[in-house]
Amino acid sequence: MSFSYSVKKELCSLITDRDKKYACLYGMLLFCKQFSRESIAFQTENDMAAELFSNLTDDVLGCKNAVAVTKSEKKNKAAVYLLTVDSQKDRDELIYRYHISNNNFHRIHKDVIDNNNIYTFLAGAFISCGSITEPIKEYHLEFVVSFSELAEDLLLLIQSLGISAKLTERKGASVIYLKESESIE
């Protein structure tokens, strides 16, 4: 089990109250594999993250089984979970609840997140697209983001909390990274 897996597992266990669930799911949705009116798809190797996404989606929508789960294996036998919201009605309801319009799927809207839950939103983003190295080796936390505007919004949000973060490009994606222990802890 990797250190990132352990951190994500611990974060999943901390999402307990209604406001945290709402903020965490918003972070998970914005940074998941696919988030649009036509498709919502969350992909992970972490079984607890898969369960969390499914449970949060059901909780926010107020229904059961809104998420379809497909489990497959990579060549190295690691499980990969693909979770999708297949119902157009459910996708539309999530889009409505998070105040998203056609031209802002890949922007962070701070008015959607209660100030007390910004860190929970960041936890959701980390669960979707983040990784962290074990502190014994080095301090390095990163978010790999497919959309540059979304990456810039995330960078500004992190920096607004007084955390030193930087943005770079790697393999066609934007990468926000933190290297100092004070910023990561």
Language model regions located:
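DNA-contacting interfaces and partner/effector-binding or oligomerization modules
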Residues: T44, E51, L56-K77, L82-E185
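N-terminal, positively charged regions that mediate nucleic acid binding
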Residues: M1-S39, Q43-F53, T57-D58
